[in-house]
Amino acid sequence: MSQSPRIAVVGAGLGGAAAAKLLLQEGFNVRVYEQAPSFSRLGAGIHVGPNVMKILRRIGIEDALNEQGSHPDYWYSRHWQTGDVLAQIPLGDYAVKEYGASYLTVHRGDFHALLVEALPDSVMAYGKFLTKVEDRGNVVVMHFADGTTEEADIVIGPDGVNSRIREELLGPELPKYAGYLAHRAVFPTPEVKAGMLPFDACVKWWSDDRHMMTYFVTGKADELYYVTGVPVEKWDLNDRWLESSKEEMREAFSGWHPTVQALIDATVEVTKWSLLERDPLPLWSRGRLVLLGDACHPMKPHMAQGAAMAIEDGAMLARCLKEVGAHNHELAFALYEANRAERASKVQRISHDNTWLRTNEDPSWCFGYDVFNVPLVEPKVKAAA
C-alpha cells in the first residue's frame, strides 16, 4: 500500500466522504482533510433518490439510511393557493421496483454521520483548512492554515462552491448570485390539522415566482422540514447565512394555502441563505488536481439533486481510477469528466429553471441511473493545434 499513489480528498462533505470510502474499497491509499475541527450534525433536510441509494448500497449504509429516513409514496406538487394537485410522482414501492432502490427524505446530518462513520478514523485529518495547493508536476503540496503541509500524488477537490482547488485550476472568481434566497426550518411535526389537507410526506407548493418544499426527515414522521425559493433581486454575498423569522415568512407567503400557513406558525427557528451558481466550467481537472460536486457544478437546490450529483461524481471518479489506474490519473480524470459533465450540466440547468416535477413527467433518466453499470463513454480526443 505504501507504494500506491497517495490520494488526498480535501473536504469530508457528502461527496468527499462517499468518494473516499469508494476509493478505499478499491484498495487506494486515501487521506481525507476536513477543515472542521470535528464532525457535527449540520444541515437540515435532504432527498436521497434511488440513483444515490445504489451507491450507498455499495458503501454499506443503505439499510441504515432506510431505517432512518421517511419513505414518501409520492412526490406531490400543489398549487400555492388552492392546494390542487399539479403533479403526483410515484415513489415508495414503485421506486424500488422501477429504479432499483428506495427514495427517501432524511436529516442531512444523520445521513452525513453514516457516511463519515463508514470511514476509518485513521484516514481522517480534522482541522485542516486548505490555504494553498501547488501542483509541482511530480507531486502536489497542500498548505493548511495550521501551518502544516502535506504531499499527495492526486488531490481531489470536493471543497464546495468556493473551492480552493477550483481557484488553483481556473483562478479566483466569485460565484454568481442566482437571484433567489432560500429559507429553511426543521421543527417537530405540528399536532394540529393543517387547513383542508394533511401534511403530505413530500410536497412542493408552487406559485409563478416562488415555492416551498416540505417533507419529513425521520422515519417516525416526527420532524418536518421546509425549504423555499423566494426571488430577491440583489443580495450582498458577504451575508450568505442569516437568521429569518416567522414574520418574514408570513410576508413572503401571504395568501398561501392554510397548510403553508400552519407550517409557518409551527416554525421554531428559520434561517435564510443566498443561492449561488456557476456557469459550466471549461475543465474539471488539470495535472494532478480534479474537482467534484459543487466545486465544479454548484446549482440551486430546486431539483433536490445537488448532493446526489456530488456523490455520483465521487463514485464515477473511483470507477475511472480503478478502470485505468491511479498512476494514469490524467486519463482517469478525462474519462471521469467525459462520463459526468453532460449529466451534471443537465441537472444544473433544470435546477436553474426550477421546473422539476412541477407537472407529471418521467423521472427515470434521473432516478434509474446506476453509476456502476452505465456504459463508459470514451473521452474526446483534443484536436492538435
From Swiss-Prot:
Q: Name one GO molecular function term.
A: monooxygenase activity
Q: What exactly does this protein do? A: Flavin-dependent monooxygenase (FMO) that catalyzes the decarboxylative hydroxylation of 6-hydroxynicotinic acid (6-HNA) to 2,5-dihydroxypyridine (2,5-DHP) with concomitant oxidation of NADH, a step in the aerobic nicotinate degradation pathway. Uses NADH in preference to NADPH as an electron donor.
Q: Return the similarity comment.
A: Belongs to the 6-hydroxynicotinate 3-monooxygenase family.
The cofactor required is: FAD
- Keywords annotated in UniProt: Aromatic hydrocarbons catabolism, FAD, Flavoprotein, Monooxygenase, NAD, NADP, Oxidoreductase, Signal
Write out the catalytic residues in the record: H47, Y215
Supply the InterPro entries for this chain: FAD-bd, FAD-dep_Monooxygenase_BioMet, FAD/NAD-bd_sf
State whether keyword NADP applies: yes
Q: What class of enzyme is it?
A: oxidoreductase
Enzyme Commission code: 1.14.13.114
Locate the residues binding FAD.
Answer: G15, E34, Q35, H47, R108, L130, D294, A307, A308
SS bond list: none
Q: What is this protein called?
A: 6-hydroxynicotinate 3-monooxygenase
Which Gene3D superfamilies did the record assign?
Answer: FAD/NAD(P)-binding domain (3.50.50.60)
Q: Does the keyword NADP apply?
A: yes
* Temperature-related behavior of activity: Optimum temperature is 35 degrees Celsius with 6-hydroxynicotinic acid as substrate.
Q: For this protein, what reaction is catalysed?
A: 6-hydroxynicotinate + NADH + O2 + 2 H(+) = 2,5-dihydroxypyridine + CO2 + NAD(+) + H2O
How is the quaternary structure described?
A: Monomer.
Q: Which GO terms describe its biological process?
A: nicotinate catabolic process
Signal peptide coordinates: 1-20
Q: How is the protein's activity regulated, according to its record?
A: Inhibited competitively by nicotinic acid with a Ki of 0.49 mM. Inhibited by thiol-specific compounds p-chloromercuribenzoate, DTNB, Ag(2)SO(4), HgCl(2), CuCl(2) and N-ethylmaleimide. No inhibition by o-phenanthroline, 8-hydroxyquinoline, EDTA, disodium 4,5-dihydroxy-m-benzenedisulfonate, fluoride, azide, KCl, LiCl, NaCl, BaCl(2), MnCl(2), MgCl(2), PBCl, ZnCl(2), CoCl(2), SnCl(2), FeSO(4), FeCl(3), NiCl(2), CdCl(2), AlCl(3), iodoacetic acid, hydro-xylamine, phenylhydrazine, semicarbazide, cysteamine, alpha,alpha-dipyridyl and urea.
